Amino acid sequence: MKRDFNEFKEFIKGKNVAVVGIGVSNIPLIKFLVKLGAKVTAFDMKSAEELGEISKEFEILGVNLELGKGYLDRLTGFEVVFKTPSMRIDSEALLRCKKQGAYITSEMEEFVRYCKGRVYGVTGSDGKTTTTTIVSKLLSQEGYKTWTGGNIGTPLFSNIEEIKEEDKVVLELSSFQLMTMDVEIDVAIVTNITPNHLDMHKDMQEYIDAKKNVFKYQRENDLLVINDENEITKNLDKEAKGKVVRFSSKKTEGEDAYYKDGKLYVHGKEVCKKDNIIIKGMHNVENYLAAFLAVYDEVSIESMKKVAETFGGVHHRCEFIREVDGVKYYNDSIASTPTRTLAGLKAFEKPVILLAGGYDKHVPFEPLAYEGYEKIKAIVLFGVTKEKIKAAFKRLEEEKGIHVPVYSGESLEEVVNIAKSIAESGDIITLSPACASFDMFKNFEVRGDKFKEIVNNI
């Protein structure tokens, strides 16, 4: 049951509120809380100089700033605490606040709690952003006023009073955002669950439990969309409270959406041909099947077909950059897990020269080697994980006698040059790192943009 936002306005007015993290989603949140009459203190590990103009703007607005080294030590004595998504609820600072009686929440939790529109929550280890974007495109194509947020789009909480009951709201939700969420999501989509973010979660079970929160608080009229090909997601129906629908790219019996003989079907109706979908790869077929099920009651088959045949994809996802000397270069920087890289490799019709490596999320790389070798002509490694990935391919050779040429470099420029030197006309070079970017870059977008810059300067 959605609550009246006036309740929140009355609750927050005059309260001593802490906001941890002065990032993209929290900047508009802080301004909004000030507008609602809260006494706001913003916390961040950066200094005022590093934050730049926004720190001056906040001071003018009357926001107290607690910045720099030891900033969380000063997180005490607040009535309400808005945490940043990556901050664990069992951190020392938040446990202290909880003991003091603080209400601990996040921008996304409060948004979903009070949002009047129909909320579609998309989560999963891979395919979240593309599926979120497809769902949003489908609803917009049908003529609905559609808002897109969460991990993508713009922070929505400060716009909550503009969102009407007939509007549609599509959210990409990470495991970090979901860990503490206890709110009802009308339509939940779980694309898949594979090992990911094990540097942040205690173990795989905690990661799975976080993902389950996307449907845990649903009621009987709500909808859960699950992947019937994934070992974990196919069993989620046992815990669902609402209606459950399934999709599969490999089988048809018992499936609500499926792929058969080159065509995509939803509830027995043909939507489109796989070859006519602009974004290639079987993983994108699965993304479309999930999206079709999520919006089936609101969107016509005609609109589904039109989006599938016109939507060109999201940046940094198997994105073609250019062809040089007969060699095609692709940017798949979004691929921050081995399973996402494997999905990207399957989109190509021939083995590729793969550029991989980066920040260590403590996930195994054996699947990349053992399941991906047929799609890899050579692999060029960089980043913190290069030795771990190299070891996985060495194990493949020792156990199966399968040799994949492995090269390595220190920088992205160096690995591009190595790949260029071993490539022949007709080859494909793709950046699909199977790792996060944080060892060398701010995020996967910056990594992808740098790769595009290097390739465009060849």
From Swiss-Prot:
EC number(s) per entry: 6.3.2.9
Family matches, as Pfam families: Mur_ligase_C, Mur_ligase_M
Binding-site residues for ATP, renumbered to this chain: G124, S125, D126, G127, K128, T129, T130
Annotated keywords: ATP-binding, Cell cycle, Cell division, Cell shape, Cell wall biogenesis/degradation, Cytoplasm, Ligase, Nucleotide-binding, Peptidoglycan synthesis
Keyword field contains DNA repair: no
A Gene Ontology molecular function term of the record: ATP binding
Predominant cellular place of this UniProt entry's protein: cytoplasm
Superkingdom: Bacteria
Family note: Belongs to the MurCDEF family.
HAMAP family, alphabetized: MurD
Protein name as it appears in the record: UDP-N-acetylmuramoylalanine--D-glutamate ligase
